[in-house]
Amino acid sequence: MSDQQLDQPSLSHEERQHEENKLIAQRKEKLAAVREQGIAFPNDFRRDSLCGELQKQYEGKSKEELEAAAIPVKIAGRIMLNRGAFMVLQDTSGRLQVYVDRKGLPAETLEAIKTWDLGDIIAAEGTLARSGKGDLYVNMTSVRLLTKSLRPLPDKHHGLTDTEQRYRQRYVDLIVNEETRHTFRVRSQVIAHIRRFLNERGFLEVETPMLQTIPGGAAAKPFETHHNALDMQMFLRIAPELYLKRLVVGGFEKVFEINRNFRNEGVSTRHNPEFTMLEFYQAYADYRDNMDLTEELFRELALAVLGTTDVPYGDKVFHFGEPFVRLSVYDSILKYNPDITEADLNDVDKARAIAKKAGAKVLGHEGLGKLQVMIFEELVESKLEQPHFITEYPFEVSPLARRNDQNPAVTDRFELFIGGREIANAYSELNDAEDQAERFHAQVAEKDAGDDEAMHFDADFVRALEYGMPPTAGEGIGIDRLVMLLTNSPSIRDVILFPHMRPQA
């Protein structure tokens, strides 16, 4: 049985599993033979070149030029194709062919090559050459096995197309799917660019606790754990906000953190319990400054990753090069729902009825501001396709944000929506310690009334504010959702290397 025999679309799942088990047994026999000959997994080879880089570096060299230059190279990679005389190797940079010179290679090497399988990792030395078809290859003068692969790669007919298996076996997904490798290279580029962008503007990168005694900084349900040595309940953080603002109090006037947050909530194409968030804070700035900074960041990211400010996503194109729309929560409800009037939004009973009809989970004790946000979430969010800054969130749902000077019923806050998804949340920070204490008390009352996502009272944070925090603007940006946009990925699981899954039966 060979990999080619397994590569038959007519096989049923049971037949395919049976044949795969036979292949694994054969490969284990081959590994046993290699063990008898000496070191089965050598680690003394050092390459001097990468496959993809060689392709780029010598793209313009002709067959005759390469033959005259006789450029020696050492490469290593995984066998992805085996055509007998030629094998295709893949490393982190790309693919390159190697030529099995039956006249130039020792007889024992040629015999060993016959036992190699797709997925095996080999080391090759030789000179660069170009085929009659124009393909670059390495004319091998020596080659040896570095790692024996015991499991066959997915065949070319079926591949690794089952979405759940791609998430569960990301290592295989990365081997066989260039699109997946590209997605995570882009993710790395995005994070590196954000760091550079903020560093250039004087921000200091910091790290704050993942384990917290009081989960704060967001309206979310936390994961709970127990610290054995201290014999106390602790929580995985839902946000780093309150610690970052403590640092602003301490004199670090521009700080940021890129790290994980944890929220014990639902799993969907937009939500993962463990996710990556950028949060940054700058003193002597307000939420409007953050809107300007965010537009600049998103334009630079699109240009750096895509080479354009037009971002394709599904059947849409988002325009990062144009000014982002700025609209209040209140005005956005009226704009996108012409059947709702200002009188409806300003009446608690009418607003409650609209929220219930829209499908919101109304408990009955909500104030007018919270009801307006519920209506917005149900009837507006999904309609915000192009980038929208939604501003002036009611203070009831913004316990950490500064009230607006002209209208104290709302806060100096915005959320950024693109493609109907929240990408960022920001506000001018509340730095009035007494107001903050009152809002924490109101949140505790909400929690006592049954709101699992309401905040705890954080006395130490109030104490920090009592020392005085300068006027400050802060923002959180979801890295995963941002990468989804920039890689045209439909699910958040597509941009997280190892997303959470239920255990297999």
Swiss-Prot record:
Binding site for Mg(2+) 1: 415, 422
GO biological process: one example: lysyl-tRNA aminoacylation
Source organism superkingdom: Bacteria
Composition bias, Polar residues: 1-11
Start-end of Basic and acidic residues biased regions: 12-23
Pfam family, one: tRNA_anti-codon
TM regions (residue ranges): none
Reaction equation(s) it catalyzes: tRNA(Lys) + L-lysine + ATP = L-lysyl-tRNA(Lys) + AMP + diphosphate
Alphabetically ordered keywords of this record: Aminoacyl-tRNA synthetase, ATP-binding, Cytoplasm, Ligase, Magnesium, Metal-binding, Nucleotide-binding, Protein biosynthesis
EC code(s) of this entry: 6.1.1.6
Example of a GO MF term: ATP binding
Family annotation (InterPro entries): Aa-tRNA-synt_II (IPR004364), aa-tRNA-synth_II (IPR006195), aa-tRNA-synth_II/BPL/LPL (IPR045864), Lys-tRNA-ligase_II (IPR002313), Lys-tRNA-ligase_II_N (IPR044136), Lys-tRNA-synth_II_C (IPR018149), NA-bd_OB-fold (IPR012340), NA-bd_OB_tRNA (IPR004365)
Annotated localization: Cytoplasm
Cofactors, names only: Mg(2+)
Residue numbers binding Mg(2+) 2: 422
Residue span of region Disordered: 1-23
Bound cofactor: record note: Binds 3 Mg(2+) ions per subunit.
Gene3D superfamilies assigned: Bira Bifunctional Protein, Domain 2, Nucleic acid-binding proteins
GO CC aspect terms: cytosol
Cystine connections: none
Main location class: cytoplasm
NCBIfam families named among the record's database cross-references: lysS_bact, PRK00484.1
Subunit structure: Homodimer.
Assigned protein family: Belongs to the class-II aminoacyl-tRNA synthetase family.
Protein name, as recorded: Lysine--tRNA ligase
Lineage: Bacteria, Pseudomonadati, Pseudomonadota, Gammaproteobacteria, Pseudomonadales
